Amino acid sequence: MRTLVVLLIGAVLLCSANAFLDELLAESVNDMTDKRACFDKYKSNICGGVISPAHCVRRSGRMAKFAKENCAHFCGFC
């Protein structure tokens, strides 16, 4: 009887540990995708050339909107 109780407790603990590991792995995958999301599409020719840091802090305007959407790394939004 004791052996059965010990085995059941061990099975429950093992299942909870596996669920915890699955949650950790899911969180690490989410973190990795967030890091990849921030990049400059036009780094070599527009961000830093045509777009200036002043465009990053403006509230409105075509250039400000473009800078916030496409030059996130240049503007320091990452």
Curated annotation (Swiss-Prot):
Residues 20-36 form a propeptide. GO terms for biological process: neuropeptide signaling pathway. Disulfide bonds join 38-78, 47-71, 56-75. Coiled coil: none annotated. Residues 1-19 form the signal peptide. Keywords: Cleavage on pair of basic residues, Disulfide bond, Neuropeptide, Signal. Residues 38-78 form the ShKT domain. Expressed in ganglion neurons residing in the mesoglea (observed in both planulae and primary polyps). Not expressed in nematocytes. Probable neuropeptide. This is Protein Class8-like. The lineage of its organism: Eukaryota, Metazoa, Cnidaria, Anthozoa, Hexacorallia.
